[in-house]
Amino acid sequence: MAKSQRSQIKNEDISFVSQEDDSSKKFVKDDSENSEEELEDLNSEDEFYQSNSSEDEIEEEVQESTIADDIADILNQQVTQTDEQDTPVLSLSKKSKKALRKSNAEKKDSKLRTSRRRERLRKEMVGRVTSVVAVNAETAKALFTHERELRRIARRGVVQLFNAVRTAQLQSSLNRENISGGRTAREQKVKELSKASFLDLIKSQ
């Protein structure tokens, strides 16, 4: 009886062990299948990351190249002489520096000319009445009438002056033919006659 029980226990152990082996084998098999799938997934993920990293590197290279091109364009850009605010800050070419120096020199010259002109105009305007401020209409009318009279007198005096000069020239040319003597004496007499006749003509007017 005891032997039969021992044999049954051994058989049960053996069968149990065999069941565990089968299950363990199945489990191991399943693990192997899962590991293959995981490896495939990992490989695909590595390829994906590699592709993404390569794309990122390409984008970075493109960005670096565009930035370098932009900086080179700015450095080689010519500076305009019209407006310094529109010029690039990083302009370092020799032509640009020469243009900047030239524009600065021209600006200094123009400022100097403007200051000299203002000073000259200021000196010319000393003692000059630029505007007449009238108290009322009667005062303004009187001032305009006086100004008109002064202009008429000045115009008449200029006309008389030109007439006197013209007549003096004609008389001196006529008297030159009638004067005798040497060249120097004749020139002296012409000067005296022309001066005297010119003054007489002005007084007679």
Swiss-Prot record:
Keyword line: Nucleus, Ribosome biogenesis, rRNA processing
GO process terms (BP): maturation of 5.8S rRNA; maturation of LSU-rRNA
Disordered: annotated segments: 1-63, 79-118
Coiled coil segments of this chain: none
Cellular compartments annotated: Nucleus, Nucleolus
Acidic residues: bias regions: 33-63
Reported function: Constituent of pre-60S ribosomal particles. Required for large subunit rRNA maturation.
Name of this protein: Ribosomal RNA-processing protein 15
Organism whose genome encodes this protein: Schizosaccharomyces pombe (strain 972 / ATCC 24843) (Fission yeast)
Gene designation: rrp15
